[in-house]
């Protein structure tokens, strides 16, 4: 087992990474203050791991809350089901909410924990690669709104993050690839040597090689922890973690939540960010193409939806959380391994990026 730390002073917490951690209650016990535990999961993950985790937490009074699966259910109605369960079972302020699932479950369970009786303890047990390397770390919680993704939520840090890498053995290949989009992101924004490692190990990762996955998760979580420790509430450097997300969120919102997986939309959005970075003269064509090939090798879509026009993108990006004083700030690459958040670009370059023929770009690789 490996242990990392998210350093937030008195609110610091550990990230445990290893095999078989779901069967080690001693890891979670120090982070559970009361006798009541609510395990929030979904209809896909619960049959696989809920009984196992409940057994490990047998010393506590465990309430299972099983929600419908998918991004389409990341809304007020589903969030209400968590509150219904907690109130019906009379859970008090010393309860601990445990999120068992992917990013949607983690975001909703965390938001519920932030709100219930004005805040109760919260533990993340992510079971997808995307949630293990990204959404479980850093305290972003929330739900979607019809007009924009993750527009309603709170910063609320967990007490601990427990990553059992064996849960990836039941992860569909499409979901694994979606998680790899976020892994690749770290190489692009802050760890150039990691890009070369990913190029050398991508097939091992897709084949679920345990050592490769553990290393990718460790390096990703270490990068995320460092950024969150420096900028918890995304007032500066943390926003660079959103490479590809502004374009990607527009895709998710326009196509309908869940039609494109989050990681798939981020991958296509990252290609657009690479293209715009190249048009600004910050990276060259070979570097753009290198990023696109790596995303392709991960089994990810690298062309935005053909039905989305530049006007569609602009409509959805206008409500992006990085908009300040009416100016859309974008996360772009100053160079490979270094990202910046900027509104220093011309409308012409943005329009050219939105209008680019990505099918032709990919075809010439």
UniProtKB/Swiss-Prot annotation:
Cofactors demanded by this protein: Co(2+); Zn(2+); NAD(+)
GO CC aspect terms: cytoplasm
Pathway assignment: Metabolic intermediate biosynthesis; chorismate biosynthesis; chorismate from D-erythrose 4-phosphate and phosphoenolpyruvate: step 2/7
Catalysed conversion reaction: 7-phospho-2-dehydro-3-deoxy-D-arabino-heptonate = 3-dehydroquinate + phosphate
Record SUPFAM superfamilies: Dehydroquinate synthase-like (SSF56796)
Location in the cell: Cytoplasm
EC top class, as a word: lyase
Main localisation: cytoplasm
Positions annotated to bind Zn(2+): 182, 245, 262
List of residues binding NAD(+): 69-74, 103-107, 127-128, 140, 149
EC number: 4.2.3.4
Keyword terms, alphabetized: Amino-acid biosynthesis, Aromatic amino acid biosynthesis, Cobalt, Cytoplasm, Lyase, Metal-binding, NAD, Nucleotide-binding, Zinc
Annotated cofactor note: Binds 1 divalent metal cation per subunit. Can use either Co(2+) or Zn(2+).
Protein's job: Catalyzes the conversion of 3-deoxy-D-arabino-heptulosonate 7-phosphate (DAHP) to dehydroquinate (DHQ).
Protein name according to UniProt: 3-dehydroquinate synthase
């Amino acid at each position: 087992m490996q242990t990392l730390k998210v350093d937030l002073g008195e609110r610091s917490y550990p990230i445990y990474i290893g095999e078989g951690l779901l069967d080690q209650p001693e890891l979670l016990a120090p982070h559970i203050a009361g006798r009541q535990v609510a395990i929030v999961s979904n209809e896909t993950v619960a049959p696989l791991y809920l009984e196992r985790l409940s057994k490990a937490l047998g010393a506590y009074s465990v309430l299972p809350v099983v929600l419908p699966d998918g991004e389409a259910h990341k809304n007020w109605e589903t969030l209400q089901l968590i509150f219904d369960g907690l109130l019906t079972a009379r859970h008090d302020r010393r309860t601990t909410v445990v999120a068992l699932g992917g990013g949607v479950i983690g975001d909703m369970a965390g938001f519920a924990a932030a709100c219930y009786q004005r805040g109760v303890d919260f533990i993340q047990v992510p079971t997808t690669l995307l949630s293990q390397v990204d959404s479980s770390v850093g305290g972003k919680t929330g739900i979607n709104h019809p007009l924009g993704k993750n527009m309603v939520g709170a910063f609320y840090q967990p007490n601990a993050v427990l990553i059992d890498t064996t849960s990836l053995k039941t992860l569909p290949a499409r979901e694994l690839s979606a998680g790899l989009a976020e892994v690749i992101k770290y190489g692009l924004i802050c760890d150039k040597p990691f890009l070369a490692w990913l190029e050398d190990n991508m097939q091992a990762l897709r084949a679920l090689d345990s050592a490769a996955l553990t290393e990718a998760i460790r390096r990703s979580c270490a990068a995320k922890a460092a950024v969150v420790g420096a900028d918890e509430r995304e007032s500066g450097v943390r926003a660079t973690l959103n490479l590809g997300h502004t374009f990607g969120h527009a895709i998710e919102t326009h196509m309908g939540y869940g039609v494109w997986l989050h990681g798939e939309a981020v991958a296509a959005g990252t290609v657009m960010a690479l293209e715009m970075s190249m048009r600004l003269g910050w990276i060259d064509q070979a570097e753009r193409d290198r990023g696109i090939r790596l995303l392709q090798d991960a089994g990810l879509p690298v062309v935005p939806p053909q039905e989305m026009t530049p006007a569609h993108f602009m409509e959805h990006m206008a409500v992006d959380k990085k908009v300040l004083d009416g100016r859309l700030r974008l996360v772009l690459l100053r160079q490979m391994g270094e990202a910046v958040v900027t509104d220093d670009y011309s409308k012409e370059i943005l329009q050219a990026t939105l209008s680019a023929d990505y099918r032709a770009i990919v075809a010439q690789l």
